[in-house]
Amino acid sequence: MESRLFQVDAFAGRPFTGSPERIGPDGSLRKFFMLDPAITYLNHAAYGATPRPVFESFQRWQLDLERQPVDFLSRYSTERLAHARAVLADYVDTDRDNLVYVSNGTTGLNIIARSIPVGPNEEVLSSDHEHGGIDRLFRFASQKLGFTYVRREIPVPVTTHADFIDRFWGGVTERTKVILLSHFTSPTSLLFPVEEICRRARAAGILTIIDGSHVPGQFPLSLRRLDPDFYVGILHKWVCAPKGCAFLYARPSAQGLLDPLIVSWGWAPKNPGPSKFVDFHEWQGSRDVSEFLAAPDAIAFQAEYDWDTVRSQCRELALYAQREVTRITGIPPYHSTPEWAGQVVCANLPRHIGNPDDFKNRLRFEHNIEVSVDVFRDQPRIRISIQGYNTIGDVHALLAALQRLL
Protein backbone atom coordinates (compact mmCIF):
# COMPACT_ATOMS: atom_id res chain seq x y z
CA MET A 1 0.00 0.00 0.00
CA GLU A 2 2.84 2.40 0.80
CA SER A 3 4.25 2.18 -2.70
CA ARG A 4 0.86 3.13 -4.14
CA LEU A 5 0.37 6.00 -1.74
CA PHE A 6 3.88 7.37 -2.00
CA GLN A 7 5.91 7.72 -5.15
CA VAL A 8 8.50 10.39 -5.85
CA ASP A 9 5.84 12.36 -7.71
CA ALA A 10 3.07 11.47 -5.26
CA PHE A 11 2.34 15.08 -4.47
CA ALA A 12 1.71 16.30 -7.98
CA GLY A 13 -1.92 17.06 -7.17
CA ARG A 14 -3.42 13.84 -8.51
CA PRO A 15 -6.26 12.20 -6.56
CA PHE A 16 -5.84 8.93 -4.71
CA THR A 17 -6.93 6.02 -6.91
CA GLY A 18 -6.78 3.09 -4.48
CA SER A 19 -9.57 1.77 -2.26
CA PRO A 20 -9.75 4.26 0.61
CA GLU A 21 -12.67 2.51 2.30
CA ARG A 22 -10.25 -0.30 3.25
CA ILE A 23 -7.59 2.01 4.70
CA GLY A 24 -7.01 2.34 8.44
CA PRO A 25 -8.57 0.86 11.58
CA ASP A 26 -12.12 -0.46 11.33
CA GLY A 27 -13.50 1.43 14.34
CA SER A 28 -13.77 -1.58 16.64
CA LEU A 29 -11.38 -0.02 19.17
CA ARG A 30 -13.40 3.17 19.61
CA LYS A 31 -15.49 1.62 22.36
CA PHE A 32 -12.45 1.52 24.64
CA PHE A 33 -11.76 5.26 24.51
CA MET A 34 -13.63 7.94 26.43
CA LEU A 35 -13.22 10.74 23.91
CA ASP A 36 -16.26 12.90 23.16
CA PRO A 37 -18.03 11.13 20.26
CA ALA A 38 -19.23 14.48 18.94
CA ILE A 39 -15.64 15.50 18.17
CA THR A 40 -13.55 14.18 15.29
CA TYR A 41 -10.35 13.76 17.27
CA LEU A 42 -7.21 13.90 15.12
CA ASN A 43 -4.79 15.28 17.71
CA HIS A 44 -3.67 12.25 19.70
CA ALA A 45 -0.07 13.49 19.49
CA ALA A 46 -0.90 16.41 21.78
CA TYR A 47 -1.76 14.60 25.02
CA GLY A 48 -2.72 11.06 24.09
CA ALA A 49 -5.90 9.26 25.11
CA THR A 50 -6.26 6.39 27.55
CA PRO A 51 -8.46 3.33 26.96
CA ARG A 52 -11.01 2.64 29.66
CA PRO A 53 -9.43 -0.60 30.99
CA VAL A 54 -6.13 1.22 31.56
CA PHE A 55 -7.89 4.22 33.09
CA GLU A 56 -9.76 1.92 35.47
CA SER A 57 -6.47 0.33 36.54
CA PHE A 58 -5.13 3.83 37.19
CA GLN A 59 -8.17 4.64 39.34
CA ARG A 60 -7.79 1.40 41.32
CA TRP A 61 -4.26 2.43 42.21
CA GLN A 62 -5.53 5.84 43.29
CA LEU A 63 -8.17 4.24 45.50
CA ASP A 64 -5.49 2.02 47.00
CA LEU A 65 -3.50 5.14 47.82
CA GLU A 66 -6.47 6.78 49.54
CA ARG A 67 -7.31 3.69 51.58
CA GLN A 68 -3.86 3.51 53.18
CA PRO A 69 -1.47 6.29 52.10
CA VAL A 70 1.40 5.14 54.33
CA ASP A 71 1.27 1.58 53.06
CA PHE A 72 1.02 2.78 49.48
CA LEU A 73 3.82 5.37 49.54
CA SER A 74 6.15 4.32 52.35
CA ARG A 75 5.91 0.53 52.36
CA TYR A 76 5.06 -0.66 48.88
CA SER A 77 5.79 2.03 46.30
CA THR A 78 9.47 1.15 45.84
CA GLU A 79 8.72 -2.49 45.06
CA ARG A 80 5.75 -1.64 42.85
CA LEU A 81 7.68 0.98 40.91
CA ALA A 82 10.54 -1.48 40.42
CA HIS A 83 8.06 -3.90 38.84
CA ALA A 84 6.64 -1.15 36.63
CA ARG A 85 10.15 -0.22 35.53
CA ALA A 86 10.95 -3.85 34.77
CA VAL A 87 7.91 -4.13 32.48
CA LEU A 88 8.84 -0.87 30.77
CA ALA A 89 12.49 -1.95 30.45
CA ASP A 90 11.42 -5.08 28.61
CA TYR A 91 9.23 -2.96 26.32
CA VAL A 92 12.03 -0.53 25.36
CA ASP A 93 14.86 -3.10 25.54
CA THR A 94 17.09 -2.01 28.37
CA ASP A 95 17.78 -2.91 32.00
CA ARG A 96 15.33 -1.94 34.73
CA ASP A 97 17.66 0.34 36.65
CA ASN A 98 18.54 2.41 33.59
CA LEU A 99 15.03 3.92 33.77
CA VAL A 100 13.03 6.15 36.06
CA TYR A 101 9.47 7.32 35.62
CA VAL A 102 8.89 11.07 35.28
CA SER A 103 5.70 13.05 34.76
CA ASN A 104 6.39 14.24 31.22
CA GLY A 105 9.11 14.69 28.64
CA THR A 106 9.78 18.24 29.77
CA THR A 107 10.65 17.05 33.28
CA GLY A 108 13.03 14.40 31.99
CA LEU A 109 14.82 16.82 29.70
CA ASN A 110 15.04 19.43 32.46
CA ILE A 111 16.88 16.91 34.62
CA ILE A 112 19.39 16.43 31.81
CA ALA A 113 19.71 20.07 30.73
CA ARG A 114 20.45 21.26 34.27
CA SER A 115 23.13 18.62 34.81
CA ILE A 116 25.09 18.23 31.58
CA PRO A 117 28.81 19.08 31.86
CA VAL A 118 28.99 21.84 29.27
CA GLY A 119 29.93 25.48 29.69
CA PRO A 120 31.57 28.53 28.10
CA ASN A 121 33.28 28.02 24.73
CA GLU A 122 31.44 24.72 24.28
CA GLU A 123 28.42 23.87 22.14
CA VAL A 124 25.20 21.89 22.27
CA LEU A 125 24.25 20.97 18.71
CA SER A 126 20.57 20.54 17.90
CA SER A 127 18.23 21.05 14.94
CA ASP A 128 15.60 23.62 14.02
CA HIS A 129 12.90 20.91 14.21
CA GLU A 130 12.83 20.60 18.00
CA HIS A 131 9.80 20.92 20.26
CA GLY A 132 9.21 24.54 21.26
CA GLY A 133 9.30 23.82 24.99
CA ILE A 134 12.58 21.93 24.73
CA ASP A 135 14.07 24.58 22.47
CA ARG A 136 13.23 27.14 25.16
CA LEU A 137 14.72 24.90 27.84
CA PHE A 138 18.09 24.72 26.12
CA ARG A 139 18.10 28.43 25.32
CA PHE A 140 17.50 29.01 29.03
CA ALA A 141 20.21 26.52 30.03
CA SER A 142 22.68 28.12 27.62
CA GLN A 143 22.18 31.47 29.35
CA LYS A 144 22.69 29.91 32.78
CA LEU A 145 25.62 27.65 31.94
CA GLY A 146 27.31 29.75 29.27
CA PHE A 147 27.40 27.24 26.42
CA THR A 148 26.38 28.02 22.85
CA TYR A 149 23.15 26.43 21.67
CA VAL A 150 23.43 25.69 17.93
CA ARG A 151 20.24 24.96 15.96
CA ARG A 152 21.34 23.23 12.77
CA GLU A 153 18.98 23.93 9.87
CA ILE A 154 17.53 20.79 8.30
CA PRO A 155 16.01 21.74 4.92
CA VAL A 156 12.58 20.44 3.94
CA PRO A 157 11.49 18.45 2.16
CA VAL A 158 13.99 15.98 3.56
CA THR A 159 15.45 13.54 1.05
CA THR A 160 17.47 10.52 2.23
CA HIS A 161 18.67 9.41 5.64
CA ALA A 162 22.26 9.62 4.42
CA ASP A 163 21.76 13.22 3.34
CA PHE A 164 20.21 14.08 6.71
CA ILE A 165 23.08 12.49 8.63
CA ASP A 166 25.72 14.28 6.58
CA ARG A 167 23.84 17.57 6.84
CA PHE A 168 23.42 17.36 10.60
CA TRP A 169 26.91 16.05 11.28
CA GLY A 170 28.30 18.95 9.29
CA GLY A 171 27.36 21.11 12.27
CA VAL A 172 29.76 19.29 14.60
CA THR A 173 32.85 21.28 15.58
CA GLU A 174 35.69 20.79 18.04
CA ARG A 175 33.51 22.70 20.53
CA THR A 176 30.56 20.31 20.26
CA LYS A 177 30.18 18.49 23.58
CA VAL A 178 26.51 17.49 23.46
CA ILE A 179 23.99 16.61 20.73
CA LEU A 180 20.28 17.15 21.39
CA LEU A 181 18.01 15.66 18.74
CA SER A 182 14.41 14.56 18.40
CA HIS A 183 13.81 10.96 17.41
CA PHE A 184 10.43 11.93 15.95
CA THR A 185 9.92 15.65 15.55
CA SER A 186 6.98 17.46 17.09
CA PRO A 187 6.60 20.42 14.67
CA THR A 188 7.27 18.49 11.44
CA SER A 189 6.45 14.82 12.20
CA LEU A 190 9.67 13.35 10.81
CA LEU A 191 11.40 10.20 12.07
CA PHE A 192 15.05 11.19 12.27
CA PRO A 193 17.75 8.48 11.80
CA VAL A 194 19.25 9.05 15.24
CA GLU A 195 20.95 5.65 15.60
CA GLU A 196 23.78 6.63 13.26
CA ILE A 197 24.07 10.03 14.94
CA CYS A 198 24.46 8.29 18.32
CA ARG A 199 27.09 5.95 16.90
CA ARG A 200 29.15 8.79 15.44
CA ALA A 201 28.79 10.85 18.59
CA ARG A 202 30.02 8.04 20.83
CA ALA A 203 33.08 7.58 18.62
CA ALA A 204 33.75 11.32 18.86
CA GLY A 205 33.24 11.52 22.64
CA ILE A 206 30.08 13.64 22.33
CA LEU A 207 27.16 13.09 24.71
CA THR A 208 23.79 12.37 23.08
CA ILE A 209 20.38 13.46 24.34
CA ILE A 210 17.49 12.02 22.35
CA ASP A 211 14.01 13.48 22.76
CA GLY A 212 11.87 10.46 22.01
CA SER A 213 8.62 11.92 23.26
CA HIS A 214 6.55 10.61 20.33
CA VAL A 215 8.32 7.28 19.80
CA PRO A 216 7.20 4.71 22.42
CA GLY A 217 4.04 3.09 21.17
CA GLN A 218 4.33 4.62 17.71
CA PHE A 219 7.55 2.88 16.65
CA PRO A 220 9.51 -0.11 17.97
CA LEU A 221 12.22 1.10 20.35
CA SER A 222 15.41 -0.68 21.38
CA LEU A 223 17.50 1.49 23.67
CA ARG A 224 20.13 -1.23 23.68
CA ARG A 225 20.58 -0.90 19.92
CA LEU A 226 20.15 2.87 19.78
CA ASP A 227 22.63 3.36 22.65
CA PRO A 228 22.20 7.07 23.45
CA ASP A 229 23.56 8.58 26.63
CA PHE A 230 20.13 9.94 27.56
CA TYR A 231 16.67 9.27 26.17
CA VAL A 232 13.30 10.63 27.22
CA GLY A 233 10.06 9.00 26.10
CA ILE A 234 6.42 9.77 26.86
CA LEU A 235 4.01 6.96 27.66
CA HIS A 236 0.74 8.87 27.89
CA LYS A 237 0.93 9.64 24.17
CA TRP A 238 1.24 6.58 21.92
CA VAL A 239 1.40 3.90 24.63
CA CYS A 240 -1.91 5.34 25.91
CA ALA A 241 -0.90 5.31 29.59
CA PRO A 242 -2.64 7.73 31.98
CA LYS A 243 -1.68 11.40 31.72
CA GLY A 244 1.56 12.35 33.42
CA CYS A 245 3.52 9.22 32.53
CA ALA A 246 6.94 9.34 30.87
CA PHE A 247 10.42 7.96 31.44
CA LEU A 248 14.03 9.06 31.60
CA TYR A 249 16.71 6.66 30.43
CA ALA A 250 20.39 7.12 31.20
CA ARG A 251 23.19 4.89 29.97
CA PRO A 252 25.02 3.40 32.99
CA SER A 253 28.20 5.33 32.15
CA ALA A 254 26.23 8.60 32.09
CA GLN A 255 23.95 8.14 35.10
CA GLY A 256 26.41 9.77 37.49
CA LEU A 257 26.22 13.01 35.50
CA LEU A 258 22.60 13.65 36.46
CA ASP A 259 21.68 15.52 39.61
CA PRO A 260 18.13 15.15 40.93
CA LEU A 261 15.87 17.96 39.81
CA ILE A 262 14.11 17.70 43.18
CA VAL A 263 16.33 16.73 46.11
CA SER A 264 14.59 14.55 48.69
CA TRP A 265 15.07 11.30 50.61
CA GLY A 266 16.72 9.64 47.64
CA TRP A 267 19.81 11.79 48.19
CA ALA A 268 21.93 9.84 50.72
CA PRO A 269 18.97 7.53 51.50
CA LYS A 270 18.61 5.66 54.78
CA ASN A 271 18.10 2.42 52.87
CA PRO A 272 19.93 2.68 49.55
CA GLY A 273 18.59 0.66 46.66
CA PRO A 274 20.67 -1.12 44.03
CA SER A 275 20.78 1.99 41.84
CA LYS A 276 21.85 5.45 42.96
CA PHE A 277 20.34 6.79 39.72
CA VAL A 278 16.92 5.44 40.72
CA ASP A 279 17.31 6.63 44.33
CA PHE A 280 18.14 10.16 43.17
CA HIS A 281 15.28 10.58 40.73
CA GLU A 282 12.41 8.33 41.83
CA TRP A 283 11.49 9.79 45.20
CA GLN A 284 10.43 13.42 44.76
CA GLY A 285 8.39 13.92 47.92
CA SER A 286 4.72 13.11 48.39
CA ARG A 287 3.05 12.51 45.04
CA ASP A 288 0.61 10.16 43.38
CA VAL A 289 2.51 7.58 41.32
CA SER A 290 -0.60 5.72 40.15
CA GLU A 291 -0.04 6.64 36.50
CA PHE A 292 3.38 4.95 36.62
CA LEU A 293 1.95 1.81 38.20
CA ALA A 294 -0.71 1.65 35.48
CA ALA A 295 1.83 1.88 32.65
CA PRO A 296 2.29 -1.93 32.48
CA ASP A 297 -1.46 -2.23 31.92
CA ALA A 298 -1.22 0.16 28.96
CA ILE A 299 1.56 -1.96 27.48
CA ALA A 300 -0.50 -5.12 28.08
CA PHE A 301 -3.61 -3.57 26.52
CA GLN A 302 -1.79 -2.85 23.29
CA ALA A 303 -0.29 -6.34 23.24
CA GLU A 304 -3.74 -7.89 23.73
CA TYR A 305 -5.20 -5.98 20.79
CA ASP A 306 -2.34 -6.62 18.35
CA TRP A 307 -1.07 -3.05 18.29
CA ASP A 308 1.59 -3.83 15.72
CA THR A 309 -1.24 -4.31 13.24
CA VAL A 310 -3.09 -1.27 14.59
CA ARG A 311 0.01 0.88 14.14
CA SER A 312 0.41 -0.29 10.56
CA GLN A 313 -3.23 0.50 9.80
CA CYS A 314 -2.93 3.92 11.41
CA ARG A 315 0.23 4.76 9.51
CA GLU A 316 -1.41 3.79 6.23
CA LEU A 317 -4.38 6.05 6.99
CA ALA A 318 -2.08 8.89 8.06
CA LEU A 319 -0.20 8.72 4.76
CA TYR A 320 -3.50 8.73 2.88
CA ALA A 321 -4.64 11.79 4.85
CA GLN A 322 -1.39 13.60 4.10
CA ARG A 323 -1.66 12.84 0.41
CA GLU A 324 -5.25 14.04 0.19
CA VAL A 325 -4.60 17.29 2.08
CA THR A 326 -1.65 17.89 -0.22
CA ARG A 327 -3.91 17.29 -3.22
CA ILE A 328 -6.27 19.99 -1.90
CA THR A 329 -3.55 22.55 -1.19
CA GLY A 330 -1.09 21.74 -3.98
CA ILE A 331 1.80 22.37 -1.55
CA PRO A 332 4.41 19.58 -1.10
CA PRO A 333 4.86 18.22 2.44
CA TYR A 334 8.08 17.80 4.41
CA HIS A 335 8.95 14.41 2.85
CA SER A 336 8.10 12.43 -0.27
CA THR A 337 8.96 8.91 0.88
CA PRO A 338 7.31 6.99 3.74
CA GLU A 339 10.32 6.04 5.86
CA TRP A 340 10.11 9.43 7.57
CA ALA A 341 6.46 9.01 8.60
CA GLY A 342 4.51 7.39 11.41
CA GLN A 343 1.02 7.75 12.80
CA VAL A 344 1.46 11.53 12.74
CA VAL A 345 1.91 13.45 9.51
CA CYS A 346 2.14 17.10 8.57
CA ALA A 347 0.89 18.89 5.46
CA ASN A 348 1.43 22.51 4.55
CA LEU A 349 -1.49 24.93 4.37
CA PRO A 350 -1.71 28.09 2.26
CA ARG A 351 -0.67 31.32 3.95
CA HIS A 352 -4.04 32.91 3.30
CA ILE A 353 -5.58 30.96 6.20
CA GLY A 354 -4.38 33.80 8.42
CA ASN A 355 -3.75 33.18 12.11
CA PRO A 356 -3.19 29.43 12.65
CA ASP A 357 -4.87 29.48 16.07
CA ASP A 358 -7.96 31.09 14.56
CA PHE A 359 -8.02 28.50 11.77
CA LYS A 360 -7.61 25.67 14.28
CA ASN A 361 -10.48 27.05 16.34
CA ARG A 362 -12.68 27.30 13.24
CA LEU A 363 -12.10 23.61 12.63
CA ARG A 364 -12.89 22.90 16.28
CA PHE A 365 -15.98 25.06 16.80
CA GLU A 366 -17.47 25.18 13.29
CA HIS A 367 -16.70 21.61 12.24
CA ASN A 368 -16.13 19.74 15.54
CA ILE A 369 -12.64 18.66 14.46
CA GLU A 370 -9.71 18.70 16.87
CA VAL A 371 -6.43 18.83 14.96
CA SER A 372 -3.13 20.68 15.34
CA VAL A 373 -2.56 23.77 13.19
CA ASP A 374 0.66 25.71 13.66
CA VAL A 375 3.51 27.36 11.75
CA PHE A 376 6.92 26.04 10.75
CA ARG A 377 9.32 28.54 9.17
CA ASP A 378 6.52 31.03 8.53
CA GLN A 379 4.48 28.41 6.63
CA PRO A 380 1.19 27.23 8.19
CA ARG A 381 0.90 23.50 8.57
CA ILE A 382 -1.64 20.98 9.81
CA ARG A 383 -0.54 17.97 11.87
CA ILE A 384 -2.83 14.94 11.67
CA SER A 385 -2.62 12.16 14.26
CA ILE A 386 -4.16 8.74 13.67
CA GLN A 387 -4.68 6.35 16.58
CA GLY A 388 -6.55 3.06 16.81
CA TYR A 389 -9.86 4.77 17.54
CA ASN A 390 -9.76 6.74 14.27
CA THR A 391 -11.27 5.62 10.97
CA ILE A 392 -11.20 6.87 7.42
CA GLY A 393 -14.47 8.67 8.17
CA ASP A 394 -12.56 10.99 10.50
CA VAL A 395 -10.11 11.81 7.72
CA HIS A 396 -12.92 12.43 5.25
CA ALA A 397 -14.58 14.81 7.73
CA LEU A 398 -11.33 16.78 7.90
CA LEU A 399 -10.91 16.81 4.13
CA ALA A 400 -14.45 18.08 3.65
CA ALA A 401 -13.90 20.84 6.20
CA LEU A 402 -10.63 21.90 4.59
CA GLN A 403 -12.23 22.07 1.17
CA ARG A 404 -14.88 24.40 2.56
CA LEU A 405 -12.45 26.57 4.52
CA LEU A 406 -9.72 26.78 1.89
What are these regions (language model features)?
Residues 28-31, 170, 353-355, 361-406:
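PLP-dependent enzyme catalytic core of the Aspartate aminotransferase-like
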Residues 226-271:
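Active-site PLP attachment segment
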Residues 72-74, 276-323:
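Structural signature of PLP-dependent enzymes
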Residues 97-98, 115-136, 148:
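Conserved PLP-anchoring active-site segment centered on the Schiff-base-forming lysine
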Residues 148-150, 159-213, 217:
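Active-site phosphate-binding strand-loop segment of PLP-dependent enzymes
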Residues 4-67, 295, 385:
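N-terminal "arm"/small-domain region of PLP-dependent enzymes with the aminotransferase-like
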Residues 4-15, 315-319, 328-366:
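Conserved PLP-binding catalytic core of the aspartate aminotransferase-like
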